[in-house]
Amino acid sequence: KKGVHNSFESPDSINAIDWRRKAEHADVFAYYKGLIQLRKKHPAFRMGDADLVRKHLEFLPVDGSNVVVYRLKENANGDAWGDIILVLNARKEPAKLTVPEGKYTVVCKDGFINEQGLGTLYGPEVVVPAQSALIMYK
C-alpha cells in the first residue's frame, strides 16, 4: 500500500492486488486456502444461530494471557466431528494446555492443514507451538 495506512479513497495504484506476492508467499496462501476449505466442509465452523453457538461453544480455561482455547462440542451444527478443539497461541513460547481427555486427530498445526490428519495427540495435556494455531478433533 506504499505507506498509505487508510487507503479507502486511494486509487487503484495503491489498492491493486500485487499477485506476485501470492507466489512469494505460497505457504501462507495454501494455509488460508486450507482454512477456508475446512470451514466450507464443516458446519461446526459455520453456526449462524446464537442459540447453536451457546449450546456448542465452550471456552476452556487457560493460565496466563495470549492464548485462546475453545471447544465445539456435541457434533456442533450437525458436524461429523464430535468434539473440535481450536487453540490460538499468540505467545512467543509454547503453551501447555489442558483439554478434555481423549485421542485427537490433528488437522491444523505448524502452518499446515490436512483434513485426513497430521498426526495424533492425546489429552488431557497438549503443547501448542509459539505463535501458532492448532485444530484437532475426536
Where are these regions (language model features)?
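A short acidic, often aromatic-flanked loop/helix-cap motif at beta-alpha or helix-coil junctions
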Residues: 24, 112-114, 133-134
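Acidic Ser/Thr/Pro-rich low-complexity disordered segments
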Residues: 45-48, 113-117
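Conserved active-site loop/cleft motifs that coordinate metal ions or position small ligands
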Residues: 85-88, 106-107, 135-137
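A broadly tuned, weak detector of single residues within folded domains
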Residues: 28, 105-107, 124
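Solvent-exposed beta-hairpin/edge-strand motifs
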Residues: 100-114
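Loop/helix patches that line or flank the sugar-binding groove of alpha-linked glycan CAZymes
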Residues: 1-102
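C-terminal beta-strand-rich structural cap/linker in extracellular carbohydrate-active enzymes
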Residues: 118-138
